[in-house]
């Protein structure tokens, strides 16, 4: 059942172009443990061996196998009520993260009921190793954040919920990018 959930979300992210074959990661919280995708796993074709169980607060034998973003997932679980996390690299949201301090659009409310989405790291001087805590802090008041030039982290009580925030944000960002490419909201645009 658990593997099926990870497979469904991973395949859906890949099929929508929100992750490449070895990018992005997924996790769920179970008590003081988390189950996270393995380092370098292919979200399109997850297998049982691609799921790693490890501690939220401490390392164990499985920790070296976990996604490289384990520290971010841990910080989010330690500082929020999230029970699931989806980290993806949606292209339009990532593009907008490079030029906006926050991503806002009427379409965000229409697609996923979101207000402005903060861009973590935009114009910030972050101490080395501190970005996980900065992301977790931003997720205390938001279900999803964009990370400057890197992608998004979405949270939910269920993985489907975090997935829906990810896809909703990307759909809204795609519309914003299309509007900008047509000159909407820019000098000379109508």
Q: Which role does the model predict for each range below?
A:
Residues 1-190:
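Glycine-rich flexible loops
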